[in-house]
């Protein structure tokens, strides 16, 4: 297909290019308003970024899609701005997070119920320990049980199970999900939460050398395992009951401050004009096969995964998901379906545009398997871009926020290759914006040592914002 840009297209392209050349850093702006701070999530972009494109490129009532919604930033911003928001993700924790962030609650009811949950869980912790320990010994298979025992101290396991048992008794599914997300949020944190991990928000967990619980008891001492290191990491694990109560209270407060209650769809104070809110639609879904009608979406704002699985979301998310009934085996199988995964068996590799194929071939000369992994990534991203082209209305735009990747010492040109693939499918790409990352706020993977050769450290200082425009007219070859 050959895209043909008429006068209307040229005007739209100039507007899109101006947006891409604006300041996209947002370092001096608060990104924790509304429900954006409900739960840690690696590599999420600031809400001001999708808001900028939503406000500039769509009108209230029009449709905004994020087919790889992650923490739901685009979906929430579209909802707040009165657009019809649609979101999909393959990650079950992403669905729970986004659904909770956009679902109004009754704060007094939730606070009262939360206090009951904590009270009953504490009673179970002190007086039903044997029963809960029996539940813990029977509710997982051996592999999952081994994972739990490795990463969670015994008293923490009992406390978490006691809390979760009470959450599961809640009848209202929306309120139950609200509490489940609060439960997950005390595990997946920058400090590793109530687990024995040092850091889960950046997705690369390391177990502590020594841990003390909230009563001052030593719950684990693995210093022999760390004998080769000069400094042994230690951690004080806070009470799961107090952490859970603090988290759900904080999340309720966020809703209360902005008037986001059941049957009360008031506009937030920081918007100039009130608009009608449209209930968002979010579900589990694969961006390579978007369950949306053709030519029905006005704008897409999304952030695709890094190539070669550089940010492994499941590595951290499984710490919570195992408590919700998933086994390690199920999550491992599920992880292989992610775009950017490193599996090379039974994958469909597309013929790609020349510069993209050249990039793949140069990497293959250094490392054949990594070359196949990169070919898989670009093939899957071609599927994604093809689907986005299908669902966008003529004159619609897709905005990609992507990071670059350096594999085996080679820059694999993510923004350039994705632009080339998009152009081959019929998109017009007027420009690529650059935004400098505030690494502490973007929550990128960290390292305990400085390694100048690390591919993580080499590439994660900036990211790219690509604008894909679907022209009003396409000419067949």
Regions found by a protein language model. Name each.
Residues 4-60, 81, 86-302, 306-354, ...:
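Nucleic-acid modification enzymes, centered on SAM-dependent nucleic-acid methyltransferases
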Residues 61-70:
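Conserved class I S-adenosyl-L-methionine
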Residues 73-83:
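Conserved SAM-binding loop of SAM-dependent methyltransferases across substrates and taxa
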Residues 364-375:
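Surface-exposed cleft-lining segments at the edges of enzyme active sites
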Residues 378-394:
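A short glycine-rich, Lys/Arg-flanked "PGG" loop and its adjoining helix->strand segment in the class I
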Residues 467-469:
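Short, well-ordered beta-strand micro-motif
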């Amino acid at each position: 297909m050959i895209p043909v840009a008429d006068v209307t297209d040229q005007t739209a392209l100039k507007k899109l290019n101006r947006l891409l050349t604006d300041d996209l850093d947002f370092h001096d702006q608060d990104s924790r308003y509304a429900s954006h701070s409900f739960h840690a999530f690696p590599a999420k972009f600031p809400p001001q970024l999708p808001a900028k494109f939503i406000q500039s490129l769509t009108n209230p009532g029009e449709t905004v899609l994020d087919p790889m919604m992650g923490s739901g930033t685009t979906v929430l911003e579209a909802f707040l701005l009165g657009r019809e928001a649609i979101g999909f993700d393959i990650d079950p924790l992403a669905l729970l997070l986004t659904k909770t962030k956009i679902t109004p609650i009754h704060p007094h009811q939730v606070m009262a119920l939360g206090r009951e949950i904590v009270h009953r869980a504490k009673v179970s912790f002190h007086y039903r320990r044997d029963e809960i320990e029996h539940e813990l010994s029977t509710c997982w298979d051996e592999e999952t049980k081994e994972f739990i025992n490795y990463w969670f101290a015994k008293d923490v396991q009992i406390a978490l199970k006691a809390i979760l048992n009470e959450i599961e008794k809640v009848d209202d599914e929306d309120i139950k999900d609200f509490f489940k997300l609060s439960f997950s949020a005390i595990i997946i944190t920058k400090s590793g939460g109530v687990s024995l991990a040092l850091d889960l928000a950046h997705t690369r967990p390391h177990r502590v050398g020594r841990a003390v619980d909230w009563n001052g008891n030593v719950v684990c001492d693995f210093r022999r395992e760390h004998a080769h290191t000069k400094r042994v990491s230690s951690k004080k694990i806070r009470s799961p009951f107090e952490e859970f109560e603090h988290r759900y209270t904080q999340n309720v407060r966020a809703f209360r401050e902005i008037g986001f209650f059941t049957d009360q769809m008031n506009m937030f104070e920081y918007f100039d004009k009130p608009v009608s809110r449209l209930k968002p639609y979010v579900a589990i879904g694969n961006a390579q096969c978007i369950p949306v009608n053709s030519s029905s979406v006005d704008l897409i704002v999304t952030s695709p995964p890094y190539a070669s699985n550089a940010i492994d979301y499941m590595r951290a998310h499984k710490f919570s998901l195992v408590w919700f009934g998933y086994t390690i085996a199920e999550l491992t199988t599920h992880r292989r379906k992610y775009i950017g995964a490193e599996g090379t068996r039974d994958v469909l590799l597309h013929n790609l545009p020349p510069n993209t194929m050249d990039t793949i071939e140069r990497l293959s000369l250094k490392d054949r398997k990594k070359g196949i992994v990169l070919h898989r990534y670009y093939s899957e991203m071609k599927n994604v871009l093809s689907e986005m082209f299908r669902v966008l209305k003529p004159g619609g735009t897709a905005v990609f926020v992507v990071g670059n990747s350096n594999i085996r010492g080679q820059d694999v040109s993510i923004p350039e290759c994705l632009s080339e693939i998009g152009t081959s499918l019929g998109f017009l790409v007027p420009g690529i914006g650059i935004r400098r990352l505030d690494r502490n706020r973007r929550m990128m993977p960290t390292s305990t040592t400085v390694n100048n050769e690390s591919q993580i450290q080499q590439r994660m200082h900036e990211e790219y914002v690509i604008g894909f425009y679907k022209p009003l007219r396409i000419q067949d070859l």
